[in-house]
Amino acid sequence: MFSFEKNSLKNTDKEIFDAIELEVKRQHEHVELIASENYASPAVMEAQGSQLTNKYAEGYHGKRYYGGCEFVDIAEKLAIERAQKLFGVDYANVQPHSGSQANAAVYNAVLKPGDTVLGMDLGAGGHLTHGSKVNFSGKIYNSIQYGLSESGDIDYKQVAELAKEHKPKMIIAGFSAFSGIIDWKKFREIADSVDAVLMADIAHVAGLVAAGLYPNPFPYVDVATTTTHKTLRGPRGGLILCNDNPDLAKKFQSAIFPGIQGGPLMHVIAAKAVAFKEALEPSFIDYQKQVLINAKAMEKVLKERNINIISGGTNNHLLLLDITNTGFSGKEAEAALGRANITVNKNSIPNDPRSPFVTSGLRIGSPAITTRGFKEAECEQIANWLADVVYNCGNEKVENETATKVSELCDRFPVYK
């Protein structure tokens, strides 16, 4: 028998307890600008840390391979219904452990090994699972990659030409580091011209889509995948969505289980349900509006500080910065900003001469700082401090002074009270 007091984490494993405490401290004292990160609510974390973690539940709600699933069934059913309502679809699979797992399931459902897939190049802002040669998607399948035009938008002419030449079985519209708006209709027209399945990866913009502030990929796409964290502000996990296609939905069901996963993580699914409920509240729309406003506030200052922004600016929550003119690499800038209590990630830019481990760019975003309560004034401050450090990487005085100012700002906006 366990005692919550006697068997607490602090009493059981002091090393892990201390590591978590240090991470809590870091999250409080640092400004989080990584575009794919956010802060989950206490309710989401409570569900994820619940006794549902103990329950095995292979299969789907109402059709399990284990007994005793009547209560976890409630959680999964609620998660599905809320996801359907949030995105206006009639099918949602809430079981994928991650966005990559959701993408893998779609591949598994509609393709055979060796089939051709057309996706965005990693260097242009795509994701590993969109056909990168180091990923399963570029090893098992014949991957063809499209990029950006000189204006910084998706090169739809190139997409159409590559589709005509290679006849892909599936086209992926989505990104990991692109600050523009995707034209789903154009992608649909291109996909129809070669009879390809069209998949949208909305992992980065799902919250904006749910709030009606970014174009919904439906009815243009056959399937959409997303993570449940990032702009959705839920637990780390994946989600598959489709509409008006029961045959395809059936394939996705079996592609997840028994295709690539066994028992679902019921504690995470419960946490997803909570996050979806939060996202259905009117306040979530206000939050997403502020996410866009804050991204624009940072864009304004960074342009004034002569930091080059790929695609000329942002129309979503993220900005991809080309810092070549500073004389420092993305790796150097990431480390310097970390010492200044500003967390970012180094990121390749289009036609980057440096390796992905070094890079010439940084990717930043506004979801986490907006959750924290930052408005335009704070975001302008942060952008100025970021520029100060990026132009002075390794300058201990600048880094230390910035770290002090960041910590003082963070004290005014605690993540959790």
From Swiss-Prot:
Keyword Secreted found: no
Top-tier EC class: transferase
Name of one Pfam family that matches: SHMT
Locations listed in the record: Cytoplasm
Keyword Amino-acid biosynthesis tagged: yes
Documented EC number(s): 2.1.2.1
Gene Ontology biological process terms from the UniProt entry: glycine biosynthetic process from serine; tetrahydrofolate interconversion
Main location: cytoplasm
Pathway(s): One-carbon metabolism; tetrahydrofolate interconversion; Amino-acid biosynthesis; glycine biosynthesis; glycine from L-serine: step 1/1
Assigned keywords, A-Z: Amino-acid biosynthesis, Cytoplasm, One-carbon metabolism, Pyridoxal phosphate, Transferase
Family: Belongs to the SHMT family.
Name of the molecule in the record: Serine hydroxymethyltransferase
Species: Francisella philomiragia subsp. philomiragia (strain ATCC 25017 / CCUG 19701 / FSC 153 / O#319-036)
